[in-house]
From Swiss-Prot:
GO molecular function, one term: GTP cyclohydrolase II activity
Protein name: GTP cyclohydrolase-2
Organism classification: Bacteria, Pseudomonadati, Pseudomonadota, Gammaproteobacteria, Moraxellales
Cofactor binding note: Binds 1 zinc ion per subunit.
Reaction equation(s) it catalyzes: GTP + 4 H2O = 2,5-diamino-6-hydroxy-4-(5-phosphoribosylamino)-pyrimidine + formate + 2 phosphate + 3 H(+)
UniProtKB keywords: GTP-binding, Hydrolase, Metal-binding, Nucleotide-binding, Riboflavin biosynthesis, Zinc
Enzyme Commission number, as recorded: 3.5.4.25
Binding site for GTP: R50, I51, H52, S53, E54, Q71, E93, G94, R95, T115, T150, K155
Length: 200
């Protein structure tokens, strides 16, 4: 996937001041965003990085069905506190299946199916995301070493397979509530997410 840097601006947020940069696929028009702080000068050491896939329901509407919104906000706060880092915000709604299919999957979850089986019942993969654009985005930001903020081993493997130097993993466990506890357990038990024993 060939994406290109197309625009950047300063972005003040309630968590601090960031820079927002947009990358676009010139063929499809698909856009991805890097929200960064402290990268005006090329970093010489490892940088906090989170790969966050778009979640309209969690990020914008504060849905309690997932932990996406709390993860995004906690990462912004962490990066601001540290003074350096980047969130790669990928436009891959619903783990890559799109908003319509995600809501269809939610309806199946309302009937008792877990997040994996709901996708499979729609003849869709449990996780359809790609991460090839991340290397281009990180190269543009001159990030050479990564401390990846994630619980997802697939993201670790994906970045390593792309040749990105991931030197450490930073766990992120926030946002558990009665509505998403089973969802988080499913991510641990069926998607191998790296939660601690006492997270549930």
């Amino acid at each position: 996937m060939a994406i290109e840097f197309v625009a950047t601006s300063k972005l003040p947020t309630k968590f601090g001041d960031f820079n927002i940069s947009v990358f676009q696929d010139p063929v499809t028009g698909e856009e991805h965003v890097a929200l960064s702080k402290g990268l005006e000068i090329a970093p010489t050491g490892p940088v906090l990085v989170r790969i966050h896939s778009e979640c309209l329901t969690g990020d914008a509407f504060a849905s309690l069905k997932c932990d996406c919104g709390p993860q995004l906000q906690a990462t912004q706060k962490l990066i601001n506190d540290v003074g350096q880092g980047v969130i790669l915000y990928l436009r891959q709604e619903g783990r890559g299946i799109g908003l319509t299919n995600k809501i269809r999957a939610y309806a199946l979850q309302d009937q008792g199916h877990d997040t994996v089986d709901a996708n499979l019942l729609l003849n869709l993969p449990a996780d359809a995301r790609r991460y090839d654009m991340c290397s281009i985005m990180l190269d543009h930001l001159q990030v050479k070493q990564v401390k990846l903020i994630t619980n997802n081993p697939l993201k670790l493997k994906a970045l390593t397979d792309l040749g990105i130097n991931v030197i450490d993993r930073v766990p992120l466990t926030v946002g558990k509530n009665p509505f998403n506890e089973q969802y988080l357990k499913t991510k641990k038990e069926r998607m191998a997410h790296l939660y601690q024993k006492d997270d549930f």
